[in-house]
């Protein structure tokens, strides 16, 4: 099964579980969790079921395309179900069956790995899912989002698409994966992987990135002051990416690192609180949709 078919299979499976199928969010981020499709929508009482592929940039992990499984940018297939259904674990195992992986014929383990993202003020009970000794998925129940208690609890399933594909296709090198017939992963992503690594470690303008961080921080504050949550959150994501570039370049000391993370966390918590307040002003409209659907 090639990568494109994997994605289409997962989209079809989760669409049948009443998930909205969305596209990736168009701002750089380090994980699918950081998308507003997840981080903002898991705040407050409104129901929300969604699935999407998210390209995730981690500058420090760039290896110029020379490492077989470590990447500047990888892809996650993200699923959020809020509130978490009682059978969410069985649904996940069914999704593996849809990919041709029979849980009865493989060693599938849920290894406790409670999750925390201090930059965004998020935490939850979690497990790594191991398939025959390889981690393929992170499974998390959100307990805190943007510094706020999660109520109801959301279930997050994050498939590592590259890892899953290397297992399914029995490949050692991610760049050898078949994305679709006639095109490999390397055909599509090797050049950008090399160029982004070169930029991150050799070319990026450190002074400019420090200036951008401060500019984005101020603009996020300005947007929040006008109750504009989504524009503010875009700038918070840009702050986070600028920080990641600086961190990868070795431009931030250990002491400074803590301070920069705290600045992003402060903004994220303000955005989370503001999002809740704005949805509350609207009367939590998705609750009304759910009530109407139940009737």
Swiss-Prot record:
The keyword Aminoacyl-tRNA synthetase applies. It comes from the Bacteria. It catalyses: tRNA(Gly) + glycine + ATP = glycyl-tRNA(Gly) + AMP + diphosphate. One of its GO terms (biological process) is glycyl-tRNA aminoacylation. Tetramer of two alpha and two beta subunits. NCBIfam families: glyQ, PRK09348.1. Its EC number is 6.1.1.14. This is Glycine--tRNA ligase alpha subunit. HAMAP family: Gly_tRNA_synth_alpha. Keywords: Aminoacyl-tRNA synthetase, ATP-binding, Cytoplasm, Ligase, Nucleotide-binding, Protein biosynthesis. It comes from Shouchella clausii (strain KSM-K16). GO terms for cellular component: cytosol. It is found in: Cytoplasm. GO terms for molecular function: ATP binding; catalytic activity, acting on a protein; glycine-tRNA ligase activity; transferase activity. The lineage of its organism: Bacteria, Bacillati, Bacillota, Bacilli, Bacillales. Its main location: cytoplasm. Belongs to the class-II aminoacyl-tRNA synthetase family. Signal peptide: none annotated. CDD domains: GlyRS_alpha_core. The keyword Transport does not apply. It is an enzyme of class 6 (ligase). InterPro entries: aa-tRNA-synth_II/BPL/LPL, Gly-tRNA-synth_heterodimer, Gly-tRNA_ligase_asu.
């Amino acid at each position: 099964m090639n990568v494109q078919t994997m994605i289409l299979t997962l989209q079809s499976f989760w669409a049948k579980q009443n998930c909205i199928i969305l596209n990736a969010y168009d701002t750089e981020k380090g994980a699918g969790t950081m998308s507003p499709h997840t981080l903002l929508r898991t705040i407050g009482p409104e129901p929300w079921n969604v699935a999407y592929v998210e390209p995730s940039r981690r500058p420090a992990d760039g290896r110029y395309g020379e490492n077989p499984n470590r990447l500047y940018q990888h892809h996650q297939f993200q699923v959020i179900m809020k509130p978490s259904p009682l059978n969410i674990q069985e649904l996940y195992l069914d999704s593996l069956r849809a990919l041709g992986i029979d849980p009865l014929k493989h060693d599938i383990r849920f290894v406790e790995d409670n999750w925390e993202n201090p930059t965004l003020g998020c935490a939850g009970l979690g497990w790594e899912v191991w398939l025959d000794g390889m981690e393929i998925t992170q499974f998390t129940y959100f307990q805190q989002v943007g510094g706020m208690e999660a109520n109801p609890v959301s279930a997050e399933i994050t498939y590592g698409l590259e890892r899953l594909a290397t297992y399914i296709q029995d490949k050692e090198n991610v760049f050898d994966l078949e994305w679709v017939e006639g095109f490999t992963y390397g055909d599509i992503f090797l050049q950008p992987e090399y160029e982004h690594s070169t930029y991150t470690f050799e070319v990026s303008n450190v002074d400019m990135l420090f200036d951008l961080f401060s500019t984005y921080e101020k603009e996020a504050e300005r947007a929040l002051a006008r109750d504009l949550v989504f524009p503010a959150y875009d700038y918070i994501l840009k702050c986070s990416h600028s920080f990641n570039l600086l961190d990868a370049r070795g431009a931030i000391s250990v002491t400074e690192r803590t301070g920069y993370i705290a600045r992003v966390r402060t903004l994220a918590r303000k955005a989370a609180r503001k999002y809740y307040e704005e949805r509350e002003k609207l009367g939590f409209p998705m609750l009304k949709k759910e009530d109407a659907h139940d009737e």
